Every structure is written in structure tokens, then in C-alpha cells.
Amino acid sequence: FLNFYNKLNEITTLKDISIETLVDFIVALIPAAILGAVIFGWYAALILTITTAAAILLEFLWNLIFKKPQTLGLLSAAATGLLLGMCLPPTVPFWVAILISFIAILTKQIFLLIKQAPLNYIALARVALVIIFPAIMTKFVTPFSLDAISAATPLASIYGDAASATTVKEAFFGIHGGCIGETSVFFLLIGGVYLIIKRIID
């Protein structure tokens, strides 16, 4: 999905993007997003809502201040916000969800102004928060847990306690610690296959 967003990074005007493409991208994200909300609970769903709403609002305010048309940019912002939320751990404070949206939308607008995209603005926003708030951005919890029990990701398990290692089945279906929308290979593949069928990616 970040590879698809690299294509959006290269576009200097939203006139080159169709509504159908953005809608297809959002639809492709939904299976993994729903799974994240199911296994990590209502707060994960709230984080996804906050990042999406914040991205749309920030894009709207930017367009309003600089007198730009409120067109496809808002749909692009919705896709950006949803993907940002999926890249966050399910335990982050709500203000982190707002901050990552602010960084991403601001970076995106700067790239559009200079008509260059040297970096992926979504990845840049996430990396910035990992550097600034490493403890917050690397705190993962056990799925379906009512309490915030720390849990290792599959990659961390490889280098940690063998007893806590995630099984292949758990890793494939996403039943392990991780970011909200990044745990399940299966549900991400569903989205990827959908984009291939729609000929958005190849």
C-alpha cells in the first residue's frame, strides 16, 4: 500500500487521480482496518476515526486558508488518514493520532507546492513520531485483551524469548501484537488482490 502511495507522491496535481482510484484504495484498506478494530477493540477503531477525521479537517482548512478548491483532496486525505491510523499501535494517545495526521498533511502540501516528492509523506510522518516518541510508538498489546498487556511483534519475538514467539498461523491471520492495520498478512493480501483486480497496481 505504501508503494501505491509512492505513485501518489509523484503526482503534483490531484487532477491526475480519479475518484474511483481513491475509493478503490480506501476499500482495499478496509478489511485490515476492520480486523484491527476487532482484535484491538474500540480504542483502535477510535484511533482510525481520529486520524481519518483529522486528515480531512486539516486538508479542508489548508484549502480554505489558501483558497484552493475542496475537491479530490479531501478524499485523498481520507485515504491518508486511514492508512496513518493503521500504521499506529493501538495504545497511542489520541493527540498522537492528530499529530501524525498534521505532519503527513503538512508534508504532502509542501511536496505539492515544490512539485517534488523526495520522500513518502506517510512513512515520513510515522518515522518522525517513532524518533520523537519511541516509547509510545513501540508499545504493542495482546489482541482481545481487556488490559494493556505488553506483547511482542513477530519480528521482535524472533530476537526475544522463544516461548513468546508468534506462530505462523497467528502471523498470517494477524492474531498478535502490532500496529492496528499491519498485523494480518491475509487481510492485507485481500486488499492487494482487490487492487490488482481493479488494475490499480500490478
Walk through the language-model features, giving the residues of each.
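N-terminal signal-anchor module of multipass membrane proteins
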Residues: 1-63
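Non-transmembrane, aqueous-exposed alpha-helical and coiled segments at domain scale
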Residues: 2, 65, 69-73, 91-98, ...
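A membrane-topology feature that recognizes alpha-helical transmembrane segments
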Residues: 26, 49-52, 56, 60-62, ...
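Structural signature of hydrophobic alpha-helical transmembrane segments
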Residues: 41-54, 91-99, 175-185
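A generic, well-ordered mixed alpha/beta core segment in the N-terminal half of proteins
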Residues: 78-146
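Alpha-helical transmembrane segments
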Residues: 197-202
